[in-house]
Amino acid sequence: MPVIEINDQEQFTYLTTTAAGDKLIVLYFHTSWAEPCKALKQVFEAISNEPSNSNVSFLSIDADENSEISELFEISAVPYFIIIHKGTILKELSGADPKEYVSLLEDCKNSVNSGSSQTHTMENANVNEGSHNDEDDDDEEEEEETEEQINARLTKLVNAAPVMLFMKGSPSEPKCGFSRQLVGILREHQVRFGFFDILRDESVRQNLKKFSEWPTFPQLYINGEFQGGLDIIKESLEEDPDFLQHALQS
């Protein structure tokens, strides 16, 4: 079925409840600033038009424009896929690998057809990078990330947008005063930014401190380069009111 762009929470609720029926529903969370989302959009649209997916609903959700929906599923990074069936989350996937997405969708279709899926209810969902079903959790415990894998993941994250803020909570609901202040500074200077909620991923939270050689949060990255925490950003702006714009252009 063709991709449906979600414009508000009322439309989303209708399509995932009243109009859902027995259909499998794929939620694709994205933003306009994340480069990986641009390529995945084409893949998402192409797969939605395949005849074999005629009984699957594909919903495209801008995570920035639909913050209430993003917060409902605790989305902390994009691109992010969630596959649901009859109000139940079947699978989740964070990242921009088309092969993983296609494989995940096929698994869910087969699972629904066989009626043997193990699921989590939407009300109890903790939708976040690294959250899977119990079987997946066992695999993760056995296969911890190596330092090289962690650094590769962090490198992708700090480059996910030209300006990336690693904070506690979200811009609409910061979980600490320092994060709230830095969000305010970026908005005051009309800087468009991506964010990552470090409270949703303990691995990122702990390892980013080493990666940045900085012990506290929030942390601001511009063009993949660490700029500092709240105090450093304040000092930089006192010295140069156009610091943020200059850092973006460098």
Swiss-Prot record:
Keywords: 2Fe-2S, Iron, Iron-sulfur, Metal-binding, Redox-active center. Disulfide bonds: none annotated. Residues 134-148 have a biased composition (Acidic residues). Residues 113-150 are annotated as: Disordered. [2Fe-2S] cluster binds at C176. GO terms for biological process: actin cytoskeleton organization; intracellular iron ion homeostasis; iron-sulfur cluster assembly. GO terms for cellular component: cytoplasm; cytosol; iron-sulfur cluster assembly complex; nucleus. One of its GO terms (molecular function) is metal ion binding. The keyword Cell wall biogenesis/degradation does not apply. Present with 11000 molecules/cell in log phase SD medium. This is Monothiol glutaredoxin-3. It comes from Saccharomyces cerevisiae (strain ATCC 204508 / S288c) (Baker's yeast). The gene is GRX3.
